[in-house]
Amino acid sequence: KMNDQIQAEFKKIFNGRFSTSESTRANYARGEDTYDPVLSKAVVFPETNEEVSKVLRLCNEHKIPVVPFGTGTSLEGNVVGNEKGITICLEKMNKILSVNVEDFDCRVQACVTKEQLNDYLREDGVFFPIDPGANAAIGGMASTSASGTMAVKYGTMKTVISGLTVVLPNGDIINTGSRTKKTSAGYNLTNLFIGSEGTLGIITEVQLRLSPIPVSYTHLTL
């Protein structure tokens, strides 16, 4: 249960990045869906894997529900708040961590959007091909196993993700997969988390496979 003592702990850890104001809670009460908004007890804005871990350890200890929130483009009610819980907004985790053009891969934090990433990659002649329509966050696309209009050629999120950093409900931080094109080293934990919609842990970093930008396009009308 969220009480004054727990709120004080969060404020001590996150300072101005923990809010219980009604206006802030209302801003993160739902996505772009038609569901009724639900205001969580508080909203916290972590910036690192370790800070997400601190939130989940504290919430796990006190049995407080959590709702991960990215860019809020969900149409299925994924990010509707919890009146007894905390919304964990990852919008400050929006850094492109590395790009390896020669190997056609990159690593990003969860709230990097597809448009942000492709704008960054354009001059290098590569792009991130999954396009679900909205300018979604990469972490949200991984959590919902997004696809899009180019899935026939480029596949879905399961096709282009080679590894993840995930914070488990108890606060443990794990890394799955690798940069290699194929690995037989143990269970495929990466695919376990893709599409899990935050129920198994919070995805904080994503390792992506990139594609060359097409030289030309052909449009067909049916």
Language-model segment annotations:
Residues 218-222:
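Conserved small/polar residues in nucleotide/adenosyl-binding loops
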